[in-house]
Amino acid sequence: MGRFIFVSFGLLVVFLSLSGTGADVDCLPGWSAYDQSCYRVFKLLKTWDDAEKFCTERPKGGHLVSIESAGERDFVAQLVSENKQTDNVWLGLKIQSKGQQCSTEWTDGSSVSYENFSEYQSKKCFVLEKNTGFRTWLNLNCGSEYAFVCKSPP
């Protein structure tokens, strides 16, 4: 009976330590897991369009990062900070002109359900703003060159 309790307790500890870490997601080497997706910071300086193209050409595909919750925002901010990024970082959000209407959507096609805009300017592409610890979004000129974060399926 004592052995059963000991083994059960050990399994419980392992389960609890792995839950919520993305441990069940199998990412390529150099990529980090969070909530069923893989993420990687690239320090290459690219325009927004070139960065998005680069992300889609990765072995498992993907897009510039979309951020759909405060938890994901914090994970990405930590990942960017750990990579000692010294400037703003592109994310996969762009203002799209459709006829006379504009819409904002993620490059992976998902709608914007979580927002964290720093301020709104008349530019079309968004970065994670360095001055806020990469936690808020600022729209800048799409032709500027910044590092970026790709998000891909596992």
Swiss-Prot record:
First-listed, main subcellular location of the protein, grouped into a coarse class: secreted
Locations listed in the record: Secreted
Tissues expressing this chain: Expressed by the venom gland.
Domain of life, source organism: Eukaryota
GO CC annotation: extracellular region
Glycosylated residues in this chain: N116
Keyword annotations: Disulfide bond, Glycoprotein, Hemostasis impairing toxin, Platelet aggregation activating toxin, Secreted, Signal, Toxin
Domain C-type lectin: 34-151
InterPro entries documented for this protein: C-type_lectin-like, C-type_lectin-like/link_sf, C-type_lectin/snaclec_domain, C-type_lectin_CS, CTDL_fold
GO molecular-function term, one example from the UniProt record: toxin activity
Leader sequence residues: 1-23
PROSITE patterns, sorted: C_TYPE_LECTIN_1, C_TYPE_LECTIN_2
Pfam families per UniProt: Lectin_C
Disulfide bonds: C27-C38, C55-C150, C125-C142
UniProt record similarity statement: Belongs to the snaclec family.
Subunit structure, as described in the record: Heterotetramer of the subunits alpha-1, alpha-2, beta-1 and beta-2; disulfide-linked.
Function: Agglucetin specifically causes platelet aggregation and surface exposure of integrin alpha-IIb/beta-3 with a GPIb-(GP1BA-) dependent manner in washed platelets. It binds to human platelets in a saturable manner, and its binding is specifically blocked by anti-GP Ib mAb. It regulates endothelial cell survival and promotes angiogenesis by activating integrin alpha-v/beta-3 signaling through FAK/phosphatidylinositol 3-kinase (PI3K)/Akt pathway.
Name of the protein in question: Snaclec agglucetin subunit alpha-1
